[in-house]
Amino acid sequence: MHPIGASTAVVFGTVGERLLSHKSFTAIWDEFARTGLPLSVHMGRSYPPFDQLVETRLEAHVIAMGMPAQLGFVALVAQGMLDRYPDLKVAFLEFGAEWLFYVVGRLAHYLPSYRRDPTVRAMGRLPEKAIEEYLTSGRFFIAPEADDPLLPQEIALVGAEHILFSSDYPHGEGRDNAASEILQRGDLTDGQKRSILFDNTVRFCGAP
């Protein structure tokens, strides 16, 4: 993939009705790890049962396209894939970032009891560290919307160095002035703005 100029590989939050961590994909992940490329999890209608629920584009965006972010996060972070592949970097793109508070909170609630359960431990699919440690490890990135009112809280959760710039351009809900919106925000420091608009993309993808 490097010889053809790839700077990241892109997947959806699930592979059909299977999580990204499903054992049938182990050989694929082993081979991908050898490339050294970062992984981008992209918004999309990847989980077929959701299509039975939605009837409008709004429902599709919020449910069928949005909820696979949580499914992908559970697979990659909560089921130990970042432990099995210690050089893997992961970004969640076009999902926004509000969803992260819910899934991190739920995992923090359930994981302590699961770690005490020998039958769960025997499956070998629990993360070795606290979830918060992965968020600030330099290997996990999110892409909030430029006008996200929770951006300061998201920075507090993952660190400013893990926030990627997002505009959704040229989608219908995209923002053609997203960079200006970041620059004009009064709740970010100049250093945080530079990190979001430039430095963090280099951290994730490498220098252009």
Cite the ranges covered by each PLM segment.
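Active-site gating/metal-coordination segments in enzymes
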Residues: 1-79
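Active-site beta-loop-alpha junctions enriched in small/polar residues
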Residues: 13-16, 42-46, 95-98, 145-147, ...
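Histidine/acidic-residue-rich catalytic or RNA/ligand-binding cores of hydrolases
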Residues: 21, 49-56, 96-115, 151-158, ...
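Proline-centered flexible-loop/turn and helix-kink motifs
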Residues: 27, 33, 86-87, 159
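Aromatic-lined glycan-binding groove of carbohydrate-active enzymes
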Residues: 43, 78-82, 86-133, 137
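A general structural motif
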Residues: 70-73, 119-125, 143-147
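Mid-to-C-terminal alpha-helical segments outside catalytic/metal-binding sites
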Residues: 79-80, 88, 99, 126, ...
